[in-house]
């Protein structure tokens, strides 16, 4: 049975803060940070934006592109590590907003930055089993980093929604297969009630990101019998610009393959939206027949790899909603004081 992406939608807040502005406040070397992270600015949510509003915007764009009846959607799953409520599903808010309720199921997912791709896999399973016609999988975050922490230079806001289905005439991209690699690795964590996450800093790269991304990617390549050169594009989770570039090189992918989907330098790490944002940016310019290799990563830790082939329908739906490049254009730059207010780092007494 053929399973794939019927439609997709992305959303990125317009507000941005430059690395130089954050470095100015904390007395850090902005040039060294930009060179090391390969990130130059990041997206900042407005005061009234959170993971739920971002998920709704992305889902609405996906529905605009698809042209399908929302009542056909049998499941909405939202992955995030910044759900606005500890007890109250983000996914029910999204479901109601897009007109999918009430004859459907909804749930929230958590797995650090790969909660969105875990939701994609869950929708794939439900669609392929025949339990539902269409499933909406979303990755959205308004990620946090403690003041002065290294994460503050990259923790950003954004989200992507993917409508998953099986009717071949509706598919904009076919998901050929998926593969996951998971271990118990405490590289990044936040307990209930803690405002900011903790992490192992520079010691998390090899045992966390690189171990799981490379093993997940190799697992899918071996499963399919494919090689990096069989793909036109590649997308890897983007906590910064350096990590996906290094992972691609290690696996045998080229800079040209990852360039179209490498959006982190301009918007930062959108966490659960990160890999999906790269896929969306790639779909925005891919041609029918092009193949995309993608691997998401989530701390804790695990990876989800996907092999995707673009269909003719991409040309029909692509321009029905804003592309990622259009969403990134015309940013509104803010200073650290306004950024701190938007992010809730300072509050009225």
UniProtKB/Swiss-Prot annotation:
It catalyses: acetoacetyl-CoA + acetyl-CoA + H2O = (3S)-3-hydroxy-3-methylglutaryl-CoA + CoA + H(+). It holds the Pfam family ACP_syn_III_C. GO terms for biological process: farnesyl diphosphate biosynthetic process, mevalonate pathway; isopentenyl diphosphate biosynthetic process, mevalonate pathway. GO terms for molecular function: acetyl-CoA C-acetyltransferase activity; hydroxymethylglutaryl-CoA synthase activity. The keyword Cell wall biogenesis/degradation does not apply. Pathway: Metabolic intermediate biosynthesis; (R)-mevalonate biosynthesis; (R)-mevalonate from acetyl-CoA: step 2/3. The keyword Endoplasmic reticulum does not apply. CoA binds at residues 202, 242. The active site is at residues 81, 113, 237. (3S)-3-hydroxy-3-methylglutaryl-CoA binds at residues 29-30, 113, 154, 204, 237, 246, 269, 299. Its EC number is 2.3.3.10. Keywords: Acyltransferase, Isoprene biosynthesis, Transferase. Belongs to the thiolase-like superfamily. Archaeal HMG-CoA synthase family. Catalyzes the condensation of acetyl-CoA with acetoacetyl-CoA to form 3-hydroxy-3-methylglutaryl-CoA (HMG-CoA). Functions in the mevalonate (MVA) pathway leading to isopentenyl diphosphate (IPP), a key precursor for the biosynthesis of isoprenoid compounds that are building blocks of archaeal membrane lipids. Interacts with acetoacetyl-CoA thiolase that catalyzes the precedent step in the pathway and with a DUF35 protein. The acetoacetyl-CoA thiolase/HMG-CoA synthase complex channels the intermediate via a fused CoA-binding site, which allows for efficient coupling of the endergonic thiolase reaction with the exergonic HMGCS reaction. HAMAP family: HMG_CoA_synth_arch. This is Hydroxymethylglutaryl-CoA synthase. It comes from Methanosarcina barkeri (strain Fusaro / DSM 804).
């Amino acid at each position: 049975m053929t399973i794939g992406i019927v439609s997709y939608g992305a959303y990125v807040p317009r507000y941005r803060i430059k690395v130089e502005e954050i470095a100015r406040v904390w007395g850090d070397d902005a040039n060294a940070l930009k060179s090391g992270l390969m990130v130059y600015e990041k997206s900042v949510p407005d005061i009234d934006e959170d993971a739920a509003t971002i998920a709704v915007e992305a889902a609405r764009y996906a529905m605009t592109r698809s042209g399908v009846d929302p009542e056909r959607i049998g499941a909405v799953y939202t992955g995030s590590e910044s759900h606005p409520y500890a007890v109250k599903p983000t996914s029910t808010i999204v479901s109601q907003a897009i007109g999918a309720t009430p004859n459907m199921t909804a749930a929230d997912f958590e797995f650090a930055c790969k909660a969105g791709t875990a939701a994609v896999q869950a929708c794939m399973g439900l669609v392929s089993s025949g339990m539902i016609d269409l499933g909406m999988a979303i990755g959205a975050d308004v990620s946090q980093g403690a003041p002065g922490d290294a994460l503050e230079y990259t923790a950003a806001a954004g989200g992507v929604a993917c409508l998953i289905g099986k009717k071949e005439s509706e598919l904009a991209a076919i998901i050929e297969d998926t593969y996951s690699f998971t271990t118990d690795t405490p590289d990044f964590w936040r307990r209930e009630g803690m405002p900011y996450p903790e992490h192992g800093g520079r010691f998390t790269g090899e045992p966390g990101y690189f171990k799981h991304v490379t093993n997940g990617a190799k697992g899918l390549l071996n499963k399919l019998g494919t090689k990096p050169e069989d793909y036109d594009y590649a997308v890897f989770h983007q906590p910064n610009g350096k990590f996906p570039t290094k992972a691609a090189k290690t696996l045998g992918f080229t800079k040209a393959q990852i360039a179209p989907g490498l959006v982190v330098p301009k918007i930062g790490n959108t966490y659960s939206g990160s890999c999906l944002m790269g896929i969306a940016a790639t779909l925005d310019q891919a041609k029918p027949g092009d193949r995309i290799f993608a691997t998401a990563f989530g701390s804790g830790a695990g990876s989800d790899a996907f092999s995707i082939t673009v269909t003719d329908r991409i040309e029909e739906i692509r321009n029905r909603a804003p592309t990622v490049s259009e969403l990134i254009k015309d940013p509104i730059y803010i200073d650290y004081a306004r950024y701190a207010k938007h992010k809730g780092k300072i509050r009225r007494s």
